[in-house]
Structures are given as C-alpha cells and as structure tokens.
Amino acid sequence: MTMLATKKDPMIVSMGPQHPSMHGVLRLIVTSDGENVIDCEPILGYLHRGMEKIAENRTIIQYLPYVTRWDYLATMFTEAITVNAPEKLANIQIPKRASYIRIIMLELSRIASHLLWLGPFMADVGAQTPFFYIFREREMIYDLFEAATGMRMMHNYFRIGGVAVDFPYGWVDKCLDFCDYFLPKVDEYEQLITNNPIFLKRVEGVGFIGREEAINWGLSGPMLRASGVRWDLRKVDHYECYDELDWQIQWQKEGDSLARYLVRIGEMRESVRIIQQALKVIPGGPYENLEARRLNQQKDSEWNDFDYQFISKKSSPTFKLPKQEHYVRIEAPKGELGIFLIGDDNVSPWRWKIRPPGFINLQILPQLVKGMKLADIMTILGSIDIIMGEVDR
C-alpha cells in the first residue's frame, strides 16, 4: 500500500492587537508547526504618541499630566521619575515628610499594579475566580488615592520639591486599616493558586530564563529577580527614605513563570510592610519645598519696555533646567524605569529619553516562546507583565 506524501507548511497566526484594556495593542506574528511555535515576531508601535517629543515642548509641570499615560496602571511611578529627574539635575532637596508620602503612594501603586497583573494572568491560564477577587482589593486602593489626590487613576500628585497636597484628615488610619485587611487576602490568593495542580502544570518550567541570560538581555524588576539576581533599585540607589525602613528583596532562583508569580506575590507583602512602617514613623513638617519654585535670576526689566506694555498677561516664572545631563531611575512594578534628561538652561528639556521596563523585558519574548506550545504564549507573555502605553510611548 502506497502512502500519499503530504507536504506540511508552517502556519502563520496573527495574535492581536487587542483592546488597550485587555492585553494591549501588541501584535504577535507567530509561525507554528501544528501546536509547536517555530518563530514569533512582535509588532510594536500601535500606541506610540510621541511622549519624548511632547516633553521637549512643555515645562515639567505642564508635562506631568502626560506621563500618567505611559504605564496607566502604575501612574505614581511615572510621576515620581518625572519630578525626580529635574530634582537630581538641579540638586533640589525635598522635605522628609514629602519623601515618606511619596514612598507610601508608590508602594500602594505597586500593589495595585501587581493585583491587576495577577487577575488577567490567572484568567489567561484558565482560572477566573482570582480575576474578580483582585478588583475588590484594588478598588480600596483607588479609594485611598481618590481621597488623597482627587483622582482614582491619573493622579497628577507629585511636584518638583514634594507633593501637591498633604494627606487629608483620617487618611492614615484608613490606610493602616487597608494594610491589616489586605495581608490575609494575599494569603488567601496563595492558598487558592500556588499549589493548584492545573496552575502548576501551566506555569512550572514555562518561559525559563537563566541568571546570565537575564543579565545579558538587560532585564529588570521581577523578571530579573525571578532568575536569581537580587537587584532592587530601592536598595541599590538608596532613593527617597527606603533605607530607613526594614524590608527584604523578593527573589527566586528557578527563572520560570512560577518564579515570577512568586516574586510578585512576595513584593505585595513587602509593600504592605513598607507602608505600615512609613505610616508609623512619618514626620511632621512641610510637604513641599517651596524654594524650588524660585528662580535664580534677576528681575527681568525688558517686560517693562514699551514693546511689552500692551501685553495683558505676561508669562509667569517657572523652573529652569540647568545646562547638565543626568540619568535617573526608580524601581517600578515592572522593572527599571529611567529618564535620561539633558537641560540647556531653559524651562523645557533639550532631550527627554524614557527607558521603559516593559519595552526592554519584551525583547526576550521571541526567544522564550520558540519550541513551546501555542497555549504557552499567553502564559509567557502574561508573566512578563507589559503595558503597551510605556512600551510604545
């Protein structure tokens, strides 16, 4: 009996782009042989809005509302790096109380970001229940944000030299109540998820990244710490007042999707510890360095000249960036968020280069999915934790 020779061509599957509220406008062109992935090519740029060029035509305060649109699930971090860069460039000191307020807000934002990673990630691997649980806790964090800043998501709260407003009356007690409520909920998540045999089969050994490989690819955040590298910029760069608080770097050595899940679960616990300590030792005093608003220049006499006498509204003085360059970075929920800033003694930056963690971490995706099954693509992509707003900028 003669067998018919069949020719097998690889199949090309286009995954995405999805809506920004789902997995984001990332398109993957996947080449597969049946269920096995041969190649994967990410197509970026669907959410590119020219954020770096916008910065060059705005003052820092004018630019602050724009930066919350990079990583729109952890907006406190994009605001923090936007004011940290000019502060470091001009050597502006911030009050101790403002630094503690920043730490509390940043760690709340870190928890909210990890929660909204956990829910969709679990839905991707087939567990729907945690998706509904995480929104319950995340809503409480957003209530705290709304009480302190007036906005649930795009806060516009950080300022050069401090923060916009102090905590309202009773906010500290509400935040402590949330911490006491949230810690048992993290234990509940772990009981529900970590030892689940179906979950373990979907994530254990999937998307493995070795220690040297993670360093060579320039990975950061939970992606790096899950591969056995104890690297956290809060410990390395000693910014704000993190050194005055007792907390540990969360890391794992396995390097797979399960390790990245465990790192983020551990980080939520550590963030609660940081918030509880900061709320108990937060000092009094001003919440903003008002001296940062002053200008080191003489009174400009040309405004009194004949040519300007009919101008009804003269431009108000604003913060000028010194003629220097500087790179500033912070530990965002997804990794190292950095700004390379060049000032030229003007109110607007000459160059504003954004180093987003998601963009760098995403580059390793094609290598991770080669040789895996099609169903593993969503598991690996979910474990990287990307937001296309900061990837495309």
Swiss-Prot record:
What membrane topology is given?
Peripheral membrane protein
The biological process GO terms on file are:
photosynthesis, light reaction
Q: Give the catalytic activity.
A: a plastoquinone + NADH + (n+1) H(+)(in) = a plastoquinol + NAD(+) + n H(+)(out); a plastoquinone + NADPH + (n+1) H(+)(in) = a plastoquinol + NADP(+) + n H(+)(out)
Top enzyme class, one word, equals: translocase
- What keywords sit in the KW lines? Chloroplast, Membrane, NAD, NADP, Plastid, Plastoquinone, Quinone, Thylakoid, Translocase, Transport
Domain of life assignment: Eukaryota
UniProt xrefs under NCBIfam families: NuoD, PRK06075.1, PRK07415.1
Q: What is this protein called?
A: NAD(P)H-quinone oxidoreductase subunit H, chloroplastic
Origin organism is Angiopteris evecta
- What are the leading ranks of the lineage? Eukaryota, Viridiplantae, Streptophyta, Embryophyta, Tracheophyta
